[in-house]
Amino acid sequence: MSQLKLPQHCQALGQAAGFRAMKKLLTVLLLTALGQAFAATKPYNVLVIQTDEHHFKTLGCYGGKIVSTPNIDWIAKNGATATSFYATTPVCSPSRAALVSGRYPQATPVTNNNIPLGDDIVTFAEVLRRKGYNTGYSGKWHLDGLGKPQWAPKRKFGFEDNRFMFNRGHWKKFAFSKAGPRVDSRNKRGAPDYKLNGADEHTFATDWLAKRTIDFINKNKGKPFCYMVSFPDPHGPNTVRKPYDTMYKNVEVPIPVSINKPRAQTPRWAAADPRITADTVRLLMPKYYGMVKCLDDNIGRILDTLRKNKQIDNTIIVFTSDHGDLCGEHGRLNKGVPYEGSARIPFLMVCPGKIPAGTVVDEALSCVDFMPTLFALTGDKLPKGVQGRDASTLFRGKGDNWDDVAFLRSTSNGQPWLAAVTDRYKLVYSSLGQPWLFDLKTDPNELQNAFGKPESKPIIRELTKRLANYAKRNSDPYAGNKQIQADMAQALGQAP
């Protein structure tokens, strides 16, 4: 069959049109490639949101049913949820120091509350500040000694705009004065106190700190920023502004199954408080839930600001807490012990383009692992002295050969304990004797000591060996405690 021949001028027009189309296509492809290259090289913003004394089970993304937390859950849905993330030491100052430095408490040297962070510590914020980031911090710091509230500590540790950083306290109402921010509730002597004093949606601590965060984000639309906001709630006192104060007054508060356990099921390092009863839990928890709800609503305001500014797709967002709150579990309140409610904390991370949405990280991690993981995602070099591990492969869904163990330690106030934790087991050695092994799969409420079971010997030996290696590598003096040393040696078959 002969081919149809177009007139010569039509062929020329067709060729010209083809060239124009090809040129247009090449232009689009070039611009797309340039845009992708720009996006790939454009540095991430870093936003760290920290709460205080927060039980992970109050969040929807960790199975909580009472408080709806859609904004915190959004972070989990669009990033990664770490299900076995622990406070390196489950009290305020040591945990916070470990998070910002990547070092264990004995190296910060914040081993207890109110100990100042060492002058030589280089935080993640300092690294990013040197890189050219605009950096800032608002909320509770608790790493500058005894000052209370002590606004804007002189030592900034890389958080350049620290006007709204205060060192200590769980204040409920803030305001501005000619001298700067102030606690806006005072006792009869004129000293700041923890009362609500009519705090509203503008002056209540959570709302006020969220607004400072929003202002910083809006001010830094065109330059990479690193900002950390540390909300003092839901730490006690259990009070919250209207309408959150009555939102959960009629809810049926679940009572922990461990609240009235027998003494035989209670380690010496965690004696129960006989004053803590089911009625105590019913009284305290509705306001605790209200604080969590207020936090979630304000985190929603912060996320909406990132969306409005088109920064949401270029910002690493981290949500975590410094430690948990037992909320009546094991007949105790607050923290300080290696029980799950005290030591296990929420940890969520969004990193657009690198962390797949909906990732679940089950392996055990602790606060010291945050900084190495963050810098693996941002491409920054770690400063000297960091002791944590880069877990970015886990968060990117590629960590098949991860060494599943984290190490926890007590404060330097009182009798020491050391713990090795995996996603299933928790082994605790204490100066008070009688090591404890919890199987979190078969005993999630931590009621039974599996240390004496014959079938536990292999995991006890392995975790003890790992704990000894950790102590040697990181110069942890607790391993030298006479009782702990003897119990570990016996578990390893080294006892005389």
How does the language model describe each region?
Residues 2, 20-25:
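Positively charged n-region of N-terminal signal peptides that target proteins for export
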